[in-house]
Amino acid sequence: MYTANDSRYDKMSYAYCGKSGLNLPRVSLGLWKNFGNGDVYSNMEDMIRTAFDLGITYFDLANNYGSPFNGSAEENFGRILRDSMHPYRDEMVIATKAGYDMWPGPYGCLNGSRKYLISSLDQSLKRMGLEYVDIFYHHIYDSKTPLEETALALDSIVRSGKALYVGISNYSREQTEEISKIFRELRTPFIVNQISYSMLNRWIERDGLDNWAYDNGVGLAVYSPLYQGLLTDKYIGGVPSDSRIGRGQTWIGRELDDKMRRKLAALAEIAASRGQKLSQLALSWVLKNKAVTTVIIGASRPAQIAENAACIDKLDFSDDEVSAIEAILAE
């Protein structure tokens, strides 16, 4: 029977999510990839245990995560909970999302309707064997559904006890501001927007979302902080055959030209001067943004989780380092 590491909370740092009372680890684990039914169960279980032993308490899922079919990541995570992690449920923040296509017909496609969101969460809870999730997100803005309906659905989910907090994902600053006004009127515990952000993807800065979120007490949970794995040492010298780009599993390979390799190599030199790997530097860089609560990492094996979680040991940057990084990114 699994017993968690007694010093796990000494290995991680935590931050309040916006102005809420919920503390999240600065590094969280996402289950988008490598937790489907085509993956090895023992490796999945080892990754969850390794993360928890490192003080990672936030586990991020969605109804459509996993392959070969939607929902398999939730099913496998639920099995891990039952097999070994159930004694630690109250020490975990479990989140799931709904918004993308999930089942046939008009009620299971991309939308933010009350029917879809509530039905989807019920299915997710059943797959994971849970009575509630800690955070339930609307996964993507839906222009065809009134925001009032989406907000009211999320509010009623909290009031029904099926979620403790609500969040949104992939909402722009304008969209976030609009729905947050409704949540304030309803007194809904809306605490977080989950968005993509990295050294190579800085749209939230141009959009103003990060400044708005910080000023208005909304946390930001960042996914793809390594830009689909491009911000790692593995691609500097070429494309390994066993990598996601090598297997043709990501569109990001189209951006890996000679100019990008030179940029990655220059960033890797700065990382080395700090005693970090490129991936650790990239994660630390995201976390230096005061609006960011947590970075959500993916992994294919436990060692990757331990390596990337170590980014929290070096979150400070000198002015010279910031200037050098900005110069490289501007090339």
PLM features: residue spans?
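Hydrophobic faces of well-ordered beta-strands that scaffold small-molecule active sites
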Residues: 25-29, 59-61, 92-96, 133-138, ...
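Short loop/turn motifs at secondary-structure junctions
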Residues: 23, 52-55, 129-132, 162, ...
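Active-site groove signature of glycoside hydrolases
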Residues: 125-145
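Beta/alpha (TIM)-barrel catalytic core signal, keyed to glycine-rich beta->alpha loops juxtaposed to Asp/Glu
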Residues: 2-11, 143-331
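N-terminal binding-site loop/beta-alpha segment at the start of enzyme catalytic domains
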Residues: 1-92
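N-terminal small/glycine-rich loop or linker at the start of catalytic domains
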Residues: 18-36, 95-109, 132, 137
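Alpha-helix N-cap and loop-to-helix initiation/capping positions
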Residues: 39-46, 69-72, 76, 108-116, ...
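Short, acidic/polar
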Residues: 38-52, 112-128, 176-180
